[in-house]
Design a protein with these regions (language model features):
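Short clusters of hydrophobic/aromatic residues that line enzyme substrate/ligand-binding pockets
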Residues: 28, 70, 206-207
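Short, solvent-exposed loop/turn segments at secondary-structure boundaries
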Residues: 32-36, 69-71, 159-164
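A recurrent domain-boundary module in secreted/ectodomain proteins
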Residues: 2-11, 226, 230, 236-238
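Serine-esterase "nucleophile elbow" of acetyl-processing enzymes
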Residues: 1-61, 77-89, 105-109
Length: 238
């Protein structure tokens, strides 16, 4: 990740108003958020559904980051420095939480000493859920309201339906949200179900690459799904 990318990330247009900060990877904000390569994240279209005279929508997601690396690279600290009581933080991770840089699997309190492949330094590695809890607790400590989203699905078809990732990031996100008592939007299942209904031909137009990054139409579709997911919550914080 570009260690100076956060300097170019947006700030609240009207600092006196409450702000909704978006935290995540390139499926939320791709590159500079300008449609480079035809790719757009859903966070670029979410402001269309809010009254921007009453709330800021600030897309601070960074491509290539995961639940641990967004913390370790200082992107989260740059947000908490701006958080104030009455703000909201919407968090979606999982697409970059595999391989050598992945946290430990699960949501428990296990930890291991690991060598960071980027820095070569040794340090403790926690579970995926442990890291997600840090966002929730630090947001609350600032008087902000966290909202957890499961990761949007990849375009992988299996037996005519979008493949779900069982016992993985989507389920862990739900479990942590329930344990911490925060709002949860199951984007993984909600969008997958909508893709199933629409079918492969139309869904193909929603993607700018083979299976992960969305086109403008796909990002707009996913932003609408975020809003739909919020609207059906028993206690919608927004």
């Amino acid at each position: 990740a570009d260690s100076f990318a956060w300097l170019r990330l947006p700030s609240a247009a009207k600092p006196a108003l409450p702000s909704l900060f978006l935290v995540g990877d390139s499926t939320v904000r791709t590159g500079r958020g300008d449609g480079g390569g035809g790719q757009w994240g859903w966070g670029e279209y979410l402001p269309n559904y809010f009254d921007l005279a009453r709330i800021n929508v600030v897309n601070r997601a960074v491509g290539g980051t995961g639940v641990r690396t967004f913390l370790d690279t200082g992107y989260w600290a740059a947000i908490t420095a701006k958080l104030k009581p009455g703000d909201f933080v919407m968090i979606q991770f999982g697409h970059n939480d595999n391989g050598a840089r992945a946290p430990l699997k699960g949501i428990g309190d296990e930890r291991e000493e690991r060598v960071n492949p980027a820095t070569k330094a040794s340090g403790p590695m926690h579970t995926w859920g442990w890291y997600l809890r840090q966002y929730i607790r630090e947001a609350r400590a600032k008087g902000a309201t966290p909202i957890i989203c499961s990761l949007i699905p990849r375009k992988i078809w299996k037996d005519g339906k979008i493949a779900r990732t069982a016992d993985s990031h989507a389920d862990w996100a739900r479990a942590i949200a329930q344990a911490e008592g925060v709002a949860f939007v199951d984007l993984h299942e909600l969008i997958a179900r909508r893709y199933d209904e629409i079918g492969p031909e139309k869904v193909n137009a929603f993607f700018a690459d083979e299976r992960v990054h969305t086109s403008a139409a796909g990002a707009e579709f996913n932003a609408a799904s975020v809003v739909a997911g919020l609207q059906v919550l028993a206690k919608n914080p927004l």
